[in-house]
Amino acid sequence: MEHKAPLVEFLGLTFNLSDMLMITITSLIVFIIAVAATRSLQLRPTGMQNFMEWVFDFVRGIINSTMDWQTGGRFLTLGVTLIMYVFVANMLGLPFSVHVNGELWWKSPTADATVTLTLAVMVVGLTHYYGVKMKGASDYLRDYTRPVAWLFPLKIIEEFANTLTLGLRLFGNIYAGEILLGLLASLGTHYGVLGAVGAAIPMMVWQAFSIFVGTIQAFIFTMLTMVYMAHKVSHDH
């Protein structure tokens, strides 16, 4: 069943209250995890600190696979923030959804193309910013005409394509997962006991698969961000 989004108008702009709520909740969860993992740092990490150090090592590996550490080390915090934020955002809509008066309030924020495309624009914008900052404006602009000048239009198209695919890939995977979970839940509620029994196992299987997909998508989003960053800031690209 399709549910409306809770929208409000303010100063001629339309705001999706569900997106705003879920973005805030995602940010709070990531912040709480970060604080819990760094409150009492120890030489021998345990618990949350051990988990956070594993995340840092994992993202460090992503960066090292795309650019040299001297160049990419400054993006470690960005990568850790991205992978944690996208992962948490992908997971929020899996256990349940909340509908009030036909409006969908609780969902994964990344199941909305507006959110994922905004994230994509932000990270691609950052790659351009650091490209200019680290290479200088003239050298950065010359990259669009290398190795030959007639590639310039294609490279402009590539920038738009990278932004669209980065955002829409994440949206499509998460949105499709939540739609199927909603259909299975409807089967369980509309067809009595038999429907509930018949939907239970597929729901559990699909939720497990959605956790896997959400994790992979967080990795892909972070990896592609670092790939795009390497293309802009590394002198050998």
From Swiss-Prot:
It is a multi-pass membrane protein. Belongs to the ATPase A chain family. This is ATP synthase subunit a. F-type ATPases have 2 components, CF(1) - the catalytic core - and CF(0) - the membrane proton channel. CF(1) has five subunits: alpha(3), beta(3), gamma(1), delta(1), epsilon(1). CF(0) has three main subunits: a(1), b(2) and c(9-12). The alpha and beta chains form an alternating ring which encloses part of the gamma chain. CF(1) is attached to CF(0) by a central stalk formed by the gamma and epsilon chains, while a peripheral stalk is formed by the delta and b chains. The chain crosses the membrane at residues 17-37, 75-95, 112-132, 179-201, 214-234. One of its GO terms (molecular function) is proton-transporting ATP synthase activity, rotational mechanism. One of its GO terms (biological process) is proton motive force-driven plasma membrane ATP synthesis. GO terms for cellular component: plasma membrane; proton-transporting ATP synthase complex. InterPro entries: ATP_syn_F0_a_bact/chloroplast (IPR045082), ATP_synth_F0_asu (IPR000568), ATP_synth_F0_asu_AS (IPR023011), F0_ATP_A_sf (IPR035908). Keywords: ATP synthesis, Cell membrane, CF(0), Hydrogen ion transport, Ion transport, Membrane, Transmembrane, Transmembrane helix, Transport. Pfam families: ATP-synt_A (PF00119). The gene is atpB. The lineage of its organism: Bacteria, Bacillati, Bacillota, Bacilli, Bacillales. It comes from Geobacillus kaustophilus (strain HTA426). It is found in: Cell membrane. Key component of the proton channel; it plays a direct role in the translocation of protons across the membrane.
